[in-house]
From Swiss-Prot:
One of its GO terms (biological process) is DNA-templated transcription elongation. Pfam families: GreA_GreB (PF01272), GreA_GreB_N (PF03449). Keywords: Coiled coil, DNA-binding, Transcription, Transcription regulation. GO terms for molecular function: DNA binding; RNA polymerase binding. This is Transcription elongation factor GreA. It comes from Pelodictyon phaeoclathratiforme (strain DSM 5477 / BU-1). Belongs to the GreA/GreB family. Necessary for efficient RNA polymerase transcription elongation past template-encoded arresting sites. The arresting sites in DNA have the property of trapping a certain fraction of elongating RNA polymerases that pass through, resulting in locked ternary complexes. Cleavage of the nascent transcript by cleavage factors such as GreA or GreB allows the resumption of elongation from the new 3'terminus. GreA releases sequences of 2 to 3 nucleotides.
């Protein structure tokens, strides 16, 4: 049984688009590569054939993964997200207690939508796990691979 995953409608649509491209474009291209490599003769020492079969395996695995994720996805409406505590899809403004001038902001999302470059962190990350369920004013200590982080939650909101 697959765990439920929570996505924004944008995140759901991105996964759906990726699946569409894999099924209707990539899969066909890989099959063409396999057919072309097969035409070269002896398959026992055909690196081109082996590479195409490997690509097919990766493509089919990703298709299966996306189908499972989309089937178990719950699309969250940002308008219905509470801001009394940190939940998935909330944004959090944090004060770094080790460097008081540093204020950072994260939005907690599913692993499938995480993108640290745009401030979207997974609820399953060390920071995400430490923040879930916390309220404004609470201090959190987060153990990460580089050591410990200490933050105070200044604001919880939905973008």
């Amino acid at each position: 049984m697959t765990d439920r995953i929570y996505l924004t409608s944008d995140g759901y649509n991105r996964l759906k688009e990726e699946l569409y491209v894999l099924v209707h474009q990539t899969r066909r291209e890989v099959l063409e590569k396999i057919a072309e490599a097969r035409a070269h003769g002896d398959l026992s020492e055909n690196a081109e054939y082996d590479a195409a079969r490997e690509e097919q395996s990766h493509t089919e695995a990703r298709i299966a993964d996306l189908e499972n994720k989309l089937a178990s996805a719950t699309i969250l409406d940002p308008k219905q997200i509470k801001t009394d505590k940190v939940y998935i899809l909330t944004s959090v403004k944090l004060k770094n207690l080790d460097t008081p001038d540093e204020i950072i902001e994260y939005t907690l999302v599913s692993s499938e939508e995480a993108d640290t470059d745009s401030g979207k962190i997974s609820v399953r990350s060390p920071v995400g796990r430490a923040l879930i369920g916390k309220a404004v004013g609470e201090k959190v200590q987060i153990v990460v691979p580089k050591g410990e982080l200490h933050y105070e939650i200044l604001e919880i909101f939905v973008k």
